Amino acid sequence: MDSENKDQKDICNKFGASFVESPSYLKIGISRNVSEGAWPINGLRHPMEGDTTGWYIWAGEELSDDPDFFVPLHVEHLKAWRPEIIKYLGLAPGWRFLVGEDNYEDVGRI
């Protein structure tokens, strides 16, 4: 098992969530400000569909209603954007996370 899957399974076990893999070749929807170092980082997983994992990830306090707010990004490229959130991508659809500076972490079902 690679270390990313192990970390993801550890997060799922910690919070009592089922593990649902987010393969590196599938896409997430992500806001551009995530790559700019903005905090906090929010993630919300919908059911997987087509070539997507179901994940929508954004940074900041507010979710924009701009139709171009989310851009598609392959999971494998998240390593270059914000590798510290990869460990949450094994959470099942219906789960969300919020992480902030200084290791703040809030994970739960929606």
PLM regions and their residue ranges:
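Short helix/strand-capping turn motifs
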Residues: 15-64, 74-75
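Generic, low-specificity signal for short hydrophobic/alpha-helical stretches with a mild N-terminal bias
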Residues: 8-12, 25, 67, 71, ...
